[in-house]
């Protein structure tokens, strides 16, 4: 799958006039503060996917090549989501999402390393879409559904079926 294919929906959303992007994913929980079934607002991310969707030819008048990523995820949208969840008696956690390429799950040693560098959750999506939306100047909120605990955190083996059932 190419970066262009992965970010196609962001291009389409921009062409349709969208100013905001709501991105969701299923992720493995690394942090001890997370449990299966939790929702986690992504405050920041770590891109270890081995690439960047802004590399290469991008033919769009609105795209910014060298874009600031200091606040890629909109704090105002995060505050609104937290307020709505509190008003409805639902807790949403916050944390740092780390993206890796799949399709294999991580090893316990990799998860220990990811925890050390500050990751709360890990997945195989979201970052390319967020980077492209940010390059278009869109406001972004991203939310992970913690579908499983990462390798070595839970004694249970990981499976795609578990991820599917819990999302």
Task: Cite the ranges covered by each PLM segment.
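Metabolite-binding pocket within alpha/beta catalytic cores that recognizes anionic/polar moieties
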Residues: 1-69
């Amino acid at each position: 799958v190419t970066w262009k294919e992965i970010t196609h929906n962001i291009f389409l959303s921009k062409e349709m006039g969208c100013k905001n992007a709501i991105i969701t994913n299923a992720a493995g929980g690394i942090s001890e503060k997370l449990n299966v079934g939790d929702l986690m607002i992504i405050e920041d991310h770590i891109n270890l996917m081995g690439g960047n969707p802004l590399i290469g030819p991008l033919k769009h008048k609105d795209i910014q090549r060298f874009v600031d990523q200091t606040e890629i995820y909109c704090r105002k949208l995060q505050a609104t989501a937290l307020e709505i969840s509190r008003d409805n008696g639902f807790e949403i956690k916050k944390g740092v999402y780390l993206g890796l390429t799949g399709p294999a799950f991580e090893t316990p040693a990799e998860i220990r390393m990811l925890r050390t560098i500050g990751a709360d959750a890990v997945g195989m999506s979201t970052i390319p879409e967020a980077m492209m939306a940010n390059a278009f100047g869109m406001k972004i909120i991203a939310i992970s559904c913690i579908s499983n605990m990462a390798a070595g955190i839970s004694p249970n083996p990981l499976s795609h079926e578990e991820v599917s059932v819990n999302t």
